[in-house]
Amino acid sequence: MEDFFNCLRSRGFERTDEPLPSDSRRIVVHGVGGSGKTSLIEAFAIANEWVRAYTLTSHERFDISGRGISQYKGQPIDEKLWTILDEYGQTDNPETLPPFNVLATDPYQAFRCQPLRAHFVSLRSYRVPHHIAQAITQYTGFPIEAAGTDLHEGKYTVGPWTDKLRQQILVEDGEIHYQLSRRQCPHKLITDAIGEQWPTVTVVFDRSISPESARPLRCLFYIAATRSSNELNIRTYVPTRTPGLIKASLPHTSCRLCCRPRDLPSEN
């Protein structure tokens, strides 16, 4: 257990004043997107045969020997081994989970449940650039810091969704998802993007977001924004008076709303 704690400290995680459990079970670790939490868990599981690591997302991570992080689907855990569950925040009630030794998550991605009290935390992201971190806090009220002395500034833009949508596009499940799908515009649901990252992310919402917004909405915005390692584009969708239609002056084959692969700017 102390070895794991040392690994956390080496990655910038700080011990809180929450008392550790006496039975070494349900140690809670919270890290913001890009804090290195999942990479640390993966490396620790690979390096130690007595450790088993799981995730509640579909993003399994293995080395060539097959060790790493596997998806947890409710199967029994071996309590003789040291077990870690990543992304516990994706369950409806973490209190009902088996007695894992470690429960880890990004607390601001936990839109389904109230996060547990943490024993180790990190607010420093090695992925999210400085300006995007500032934008996330401005929109959500969630604290997140860009890590490192050589700060990568990054950039973010704000505008209507009639501005060109650059990949990767992330949206809620609903009207925006429907409209992009009928125009065959490549995009992902925000809930399917947990664990992913891209240089450029465009997030489209149909309402304004602020620290006063409902927590689930702020969590979804946070998930989308922390997927970006360079550029974040925030777009607002305004529906027309006619349900199911989008006001567009250009024909569908050249519609600026549709970022077909042939229209995408080069990443080079």
UniProtKB/Swiss-Prot annotation:
It comes from the Viruses. GO terms for cellular component: host cell cytoplasm. Transmembrane segments: none annotated. Keywords: Host cytoplasm, Host-virus interaction, Inhibition of host innate immune response by virus, RNA-binding, Suppressor of RNA silencing, Transport, Viral immunoevasion, Viral movement protein. One of its GO terms (biological process) is transport of virus in host, cell to cell. The keyword RNA-binding applies. GO terms for molecular function: ATP binding; RNA binding. Its main location: host cell. It is found in: Host cytoplasm. Residues 1-138 form the (+)RNA virus helicase ATP-binding domain. It holds the Pfam family Viral_helicase1. Residues 139-268 form the (+)RNA virus helicase C-terminal domain. Transports viral genome to neighboring plant cells directly through plasmosdesmata, without any budding. The movement protein allows efficient cell to cell propagation, by bypassing the host cell wall barrier. Increases plasmodesma size exclusion limit. Acts as a suppressor of RNA-mediated gene silencing, also known as post-transcriptional gene silencing (PTGS), a mechanism of plant viral defense that limits the accumulation of viral RNAs. Homodimer and homooligomer. Interacts with capsid protein. Interacts with host AGO1; this interaction targets the host protein for degradation, thereby suppressing the antiviral RNA silencing. TGBp1, TGBp2 and TGBp3 seem to act together for cell-to-cell propagation. TGBp1 is the main movement protein that physically cross the plasmodesma with the viral genome. TGBp2 and TGBp3 would facilitate TGBp1 function. Belongs to the Tymovirales TGBp1 protein family. This is Movement and silencing protein TGBp1. The gene is ORF2.
